[in-house]
């Protein structure tokens, strides 16, 4: 029986693809070598230890229906669209070796006519007249008996959108967590006009088979053709949850300030695991009572725009005469934390 396994996803759902990756990694025999090929529709994927409010323009992502997905590996934030090809190599130890998977990708690119080289810890670059340009970034995860290397290849990604979503608003965040390093990037279509996802997948597959001297049939997976993966439903539920994608952010503080016609407001939040652990308000409003009441309501709550807005509007019962102020405050807070 072959020790290789080849899976190709026809789903563009990042939560589905990352859940499949997680299940296969957890349950694969330690003797197996796996190649998983996939791609995501509009998504910002962040590293396991990153803060989405710090890394991403979360407001613009929500407006443009761009998903957030936290992966289980470390590293920085990346924007995925259908112009990216994603790959994952998995193997048991001691055979797991990220230099092997890197060489497979480099061999695939070479077969397509692109001369690339490894750079730093996790990038592949090509040399251009303007200098080195990144075409691939990777991240890694290891456990006691296995490891994986996953990454992306830029085929025809919309690089302008990359800048839109990975440049966060200038919020006053004093945050822990890993900050992404921005690199100069280029698309493979600049070097190979017309290159497709299918061609790149075929080249990586051939290089994978050539390295191990074996061939296997591809398993095509989708939400309708999920392979036999125990606990997949639970893994997908976790991967797609707010608690995982946002709530796992490292502790941070957020300062919001605004001046309204009725006074200036400064709100200080301390947030841990997506929950507000401390809320303070400072204001020169002639009627600060609603704001003081708000901080008490927010303590311990989720740091989510809809929840903050809900708590603001709940104060209308106790402070009906301040309806105008509370509605203005509600709209502002909801927009400021997205």
Curated annotation (Swiss-Prot):
InterPro entries: aa-tRNA-synth_II/BPL/LPL, BPL_LPL_catalytic, Lipoate_ligase_A, Lipoate_protein_ligase_C, LipoylTrfase_LipoateP_Ligase. Pathway: Protein modification; protein lipoylation via exogenous pathway; protein N(6)-(lipoyl)lysine from lipoate: step 1/2; Protein modification; protein lipoylation via exogenous pathway; protein N(6)-(lipoyl)lysine from lipoate: step 2/2. Residues 29-216 form the BPL/LPL catalytic domain. GO terms for biological process: protein modification process. ATP binds at residues 71, 76-79, 134. It is found in: Cytoplasm. Its main location: cytoplasm. This is Lipoate-protein ligase A.
């Amino acid at each position: 029986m072959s020790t290789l396994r080849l899976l190709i996803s026809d789903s563009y759902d990042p939560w589905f693809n990352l859940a499949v990756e997680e299940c296969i990694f957890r349950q694969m025999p330690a003797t197996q070598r796996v190649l998983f090929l996939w791609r995501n529709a509009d998504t910002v994927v962040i590293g396991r230890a990153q803060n989405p409010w710090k890394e991403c323009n979360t407001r613009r992502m929500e407006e443009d229906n761009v998903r957030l997905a936290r992966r289980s590996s470390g590293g920085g934030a990346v924007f995925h669209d259908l112009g990216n090809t994603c790959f994952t190599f998995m193997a048991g130890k001691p055979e797991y070796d990220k230099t092997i998977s890197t060489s497979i990708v480099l061999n695939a690119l070479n077969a397509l006519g692109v001369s690339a080289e490894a750079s730093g810890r996790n990038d592949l670059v090509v040399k251009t007249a303007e200098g080195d340009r990144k075409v691939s970034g990777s991240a890694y995860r290891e456990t006691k008996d296995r490891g994986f290397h996953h990454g992306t290849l830029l085929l025809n990604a919309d690089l302008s959108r990359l800048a839109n979503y990975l440049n966060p608003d200038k919020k006053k965040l004093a945050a822990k967590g890993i900050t992404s390093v921005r690199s100069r990037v280029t698309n493979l279509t600049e070097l190979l006009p017309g290159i497709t996802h299918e061609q790149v997948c075929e080249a990586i597959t051939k290089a994978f088979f050539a390295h191990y001297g074996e061939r296997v049939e591809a398993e095509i997976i989708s939400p309708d053709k999920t392979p036999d993966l125990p606990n997949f439903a639970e893994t997908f539920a976790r991967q797609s949850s707010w608690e995982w994608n946002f709530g796992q952010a490292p502790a941070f503080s957020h300062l919001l300030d605004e001046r309204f016609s009725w006074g200036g407001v400064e709100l200080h939040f301390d947030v841990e695991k997506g929950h507000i652990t401390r809320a303070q308000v400072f204001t020169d409003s002639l009627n600060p009572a609603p704001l003081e009441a708000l901080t008490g309501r927010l303590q311990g709550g989720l740091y989510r725009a809809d929840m903050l807005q809900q708590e603001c509007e709940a104060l209308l019962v106790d402070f009906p005469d301040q309806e105008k102020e509370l509605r203005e405050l509600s709209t502002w807070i909801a927009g400021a934390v997205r």
